[in-house]
Regions:
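C-terminal and inter-domain tail/linker signature
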Residues: 1-140
Length: 140
């Protein structure tokens, strides 16, 4: 893995896991495009990323993310990750349940001039809802 990309991933994951909103946001370009498949439309700008992070941390104050795998080139990274947390605040209009969740997902991140220009997240919303006991286990 390229040293610059390796440093980015290490610093980025550390910022997420220490809940350093300023450090996470600093990795995003001011005009970035942030796409989360669970949302109806993309978000634009580093401030929208900051608001999203604060929203997640209010809902899951013990939020932690593990980078399971990464495939990278000079300016792109495909990341497979798992995040965990305890549902202590309203999330997606779901009142706090106090339940622990484990969510798996992937991100495709594009860097430009050392900043995230575009991020696309695809994650297991059904798994989150199952952990919150709002969706039954799938059988068969």
């Amino acid at each position: 893995m390229d040293t610059k990309m390796s440093e980015f991933l290490n610093e980025f994951m550390t910022a997420w896991n220490t809940h350093d909103v300023r450090a996470v946001t600093a990795w995003y370009a001011a005009d970035c495009e942030d796409i989360d498949v669970a949302r109806t439309r993309p978000q634009y700008g580093a401030d929208s990323v900051r608001r999203t992070l604060v929203y997640y941390l209010r809902a899951f104050p013990d939020f932690q993310v593990t980078l399971n795998d990464a495939v990278v080139d000079d300016e792109r990274a495909a990341l497979y990750w798992t995040w965990t947390g305890t549902h202590r605040g309203t999330f997606m209009n779901i009142p706090p349940t106090g339940r622990r969740v484990t969510v798996r997902g992937s991100s495709l991140v594009t860097l430009k001039d050392g900043k995230i220009q575009r991020a696309v997240r695809i994650w297991d919303l059904a798994g989150l809802l199952r952990d919150l006991k709002l969706l039954p286990e799938l059988t068969g």
